[in-house]
Each structure stands twice: as C-alpha cells, then as structure tokens.
C-alpha cells in the first residue's frame, strides 16, 4: 500500500505532488514519515529537482479585444518572488497598463504565450482563458482568474476534461476575511468612479453649482440606482464633482451608506434583502411600487447611473422605455449593468444611443478604461488569494479552507461549483 501511495504521488507534477501527499497523510497520518523516508531513499533525484524548481507563475498577455489590464503588476510580481515563486511574464503583457517588460525586475520575460503556457505551473489571468489558451496549458497546471462560467460553459468543459485545477475569482465568498481577495468589489469600485466621469463628460451642463458674472449655475441632479460598491463609488465621485446626488437601492440597509456620502436616499417603501449581499428578485407588486416612486426622480434627474447587476444573471429592467421618453431633453443615462443586458430597456450594450433626446450609454468592461489602478487592485486581490496556498515556493492549498474550496471551479476532472456543474451537465 505504501509503495502504491509513493508511485501515485511521485508521478504527479510538482504543483500537484504536495497536495496529493497532504491528502494521503491527512487521512493516514502514520504514512507521513514512512513515505517521506522511502521517497528520500528511492527517489533522491526527484526530491532534489523539486527543491531546485519552485512553482512557476505565468502572466500571459490578455487577448480579449479592448482588454488593457494585466493580472500581475511589477510590484506584486516582486512579492510573489519573495514567496519563492518563479515569475514568468509574456513579453508585452503589461503594455496596456503602461508597464514595460523592463519594469518586471526579477521576473523572466517569455517571448510568446505558447512558451509561457508550456512552462507555467500556475497561470493568472484577468479575462477567462480561451479554448486555444486552455489547449496550450500543460498537464497538471492551475489557472486563476475571472472565469465567467455562466457565459463560457464550453471552456469549463475543457478545463474539466483536461483535469486542470481552476479558481474562479468571482466565486470568492463574501466574508470578512476574504474582502482583500474580492475582485468583484475592487473592479466595481473602478467602474463606479469611471461611470460618474462618463456622465459628466456627456452631460450638457456643469455638475457643480457655479457663481459667475452671468449669474448662478445650478448643480446637476444625479440619481444613482443600486448602492453596491459601484453605486457607492459613483455617488461619492458625483458628490466630489459638486452634483446634487440621490441614491436608491432595494436593500434598506444601504440607506446609511448612501447618506454617509452626503447623498439623499430615495425610499420607495420596498425592501428586498437577499443572500450573499445581493438583492432578491422583486414581486410584481413590489416592482410596480418601486416604479411609481422612481419615475418621479428619474424624470427630474439630469443624469441617471444604474448599477443593479447580479453575476451570472440578466440585469433587472428598472427603467422602461416610456420613462426614458419622459426624461429631460439632454439627460444622460450611464448603464453599468449593460454586461447583463442593462437596467434600461433601450440600452444597447457597448453602444451610445440617443433615444427621445436622452443619451443612453451602455459601456462594457469599464475597469479596463482605468488599467493602471484596476490592474494594481486586481493583482493585489490575486496575491492575497494565492499567498496562503504558497509555502517556500511550493503550492499547498488547504481544501478545508472555505475561501479556497468555494472558489474552486474545476479539480481532478470534476466541476466543483454546483450551479456551473448543473449548467454544463
């Protein structure tokens, strides 16, 4: 039995050997010293090779159209190096975020993606890996990034069939100790900030009140729908720009957060607290009550920013077409929920249109428009997520850890995330 265990763990790549060894010895503790001594006696060359070969962290260049972020910035690459990890960076990976190859001091610059995937044990990405990229990853590799399994089930199948270990960063549980790993929150903060700037840029008037020789200019009225991370950042930014800001969310608990930023909370009398920090779906009666109150505020607004989105599900329709047609001429709607179809009925994802003299813009991949800080925040999220799994340059995930277990998408040829498994079949 002992020799059988040795054969199994010894045949695995370095990155998976330690996880398998830990699994055996966890359930049969007495085997730990025996296996260790036998491996030392029977396979000294393999052990020496493992000591000389720390895991290799691969940072490829993002291939998605318009994606300017990079998964690891130079400062974070140095942090990984201090953990004993060898960092490989594809040439040009940081160009979109204004990080040159030379700025990745201590990292190895690899000329092509194919060469990087052939060497990397642990791959980190912003966008989900494409089918071609998955095909280039070596056996036993691990990949971490935003996987969007609901949008790309075929890619999840490939990860499963190739028996790759994958972590979906959007599945990191929303608990206190995982806040520093939460890529959804960090990137939503970027999107909320940028949304307020997009609105100000498209508005036909000033945001702040101005007193001029020609008289006083009234401040713009801004309504932000959805008081999650993106919505609160949009509120804060619009306030800094001098606008009169109102905020709305179906979760009553957000009132205090909205008001703490100096905005007025719109109370529709509807409260819909859900699980995981998200709102539950409204009943038809609640939707009608919500609409009656919101329509008045939308009609009075110069700018409306919508942020109501739930990962993996269509965005709720909050602003009807006829409501848009009753808005002020020249009013602006920035629909941050466009990735899921939009909160406004007339939103065309990725496009700016004018409907009944109202500007409606549904931007996509907004964090990529601020690549420097979006990349920095994302890289720190990855560092905080992966650091507990790395010990002396070796990959040792604790599968009993809630954060690690909940974030695992595929492992050992299985889809571990239940909703994705049901979707893929």
Where do the model's predicted regions map?
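ADP-ribose/adenylate-binding Rossmann-like module
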Residues: 139-158, 165, 304-348, 352, ...
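Residue-level detector of alpha-helix initiation sites
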Residues: 128, 190, 228-229
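Glycine/serine-rich phosphate-binding loop and adjoining beta1-alpha1 elements at the start
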Residues: 62, 131-221
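An N-terminal-biased, well-structured beta-alpha scaffold segment characteristic
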Residues: 47-158, 162
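A structured beta-alpha segment of the ubiquitous adenosine-cofactor-binding alpha/beta core
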Residues: 108-118, 128-129, 275-303, 308-321, ...
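Adenosine-phosphate binding glycine-rich loop
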Residues: 170-172, 176-213, 338, 344-425
